[in-house]
């Protein structure tokens, strides 16, 4: 029941919490909007399209593996970007978050929403985030939202955050999602968004 209810809550015909979460991520961006953005785990392209519309001088890349379990695809993302009039600035690539086919120090902003916990290519989540930071320019900004407090996936939360601070980053902030926005009780379940945390900072 919890999973079917959460699917309803995230759907456009429901209360659209996915859009609310994406709005929160966009609001947390502290950047002039001139440069390149990477969205890791772009899904349907919803977040990257919102970023493209918010920052009209940016150029954006969305990567996803688009596995069989998801109804999204690269073609659908491109179509969605075209509908919103941003397809000339947005590019989509099929790739794994564990091995980004991108150059070092290439992006001014890197974002990811509820992707890292899904990546099966590696169990080392620190290495996964290290790979995301690799493609970020020095001084560039990152905003990651995921189930970072789920210790079965990310290990002890305090130890996880301490290990992140040892990466090539100059600043790290962490916020519990439930303290940043109001969520219905069922979405606060640990299996849904109860373990969700936002990590933001600079390289």
PLM region spans:
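Class I SAM-dependent methyltransferase Rossmann-like catalytic core
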Residues: 2-24
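Conserved class I S-adenosyl-L-methionine
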Residues: 33-43, 61
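Conserved SAM-binding loop of SAM-dependent methyltransferases across substrates and taxa
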Residues: 44-56
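Conserved SAM-binding strand-loop segment of SAM-dependent methyltransferases
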Residues: 85-97
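A short glycine-rich, Lys/Arg-flanked "PGG" loop and its adjoining helix->strand segment in the class I
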Residues: 126-138
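Conserved beta-strand signature within the Rossmann-like core of class I S-adenosyl-L-methionine
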Residues: 139-146
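Core SAM-dependent methyltransferase catalytic element
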Residues: 181-203
């Amino acid at each position: 029941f919890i999973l079917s209810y959460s699917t309803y809550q995230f759907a456009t015909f429901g209360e659209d919490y996915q859009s609310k979460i994406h709005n929160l991520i966009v609001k947390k961006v502290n950047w002039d909007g001139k440069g390149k953005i990477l969205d890791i785990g772009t899904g349907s392209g919803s977040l990257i399209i919102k970023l493209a519309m918010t920052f009209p001088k940016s150029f954006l890349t969305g990567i996803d593996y688009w596995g069989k379990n998801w109804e999204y695809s690269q073609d659908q993302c491109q179509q969605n970007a075209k509908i919103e009039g941003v397809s000339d600035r947005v590019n989509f690539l099929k790739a794994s978050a564990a091995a980004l086919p991108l150059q070092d120090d290439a992006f001014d902003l890197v974002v990811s929403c509820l992707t890292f916990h899904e990546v099966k290519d590696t169990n080392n989540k620190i290495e996964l985030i290290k790979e995301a930071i690799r493609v970020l320019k020095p001084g560039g900004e990152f905003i990651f939202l995921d189930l970072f407090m789920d210790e079965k996936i990310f290990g002890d939360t305090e130890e996880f955050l301490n290990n992140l601070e040892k990466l090539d980053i100059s600043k790290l902030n962490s916020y519990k999602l439930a303290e940043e926005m109001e969520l219905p009780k069922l979405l606060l379940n640990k299996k849904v968004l109860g373990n969700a945390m936002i990590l933001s900072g600079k390289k």
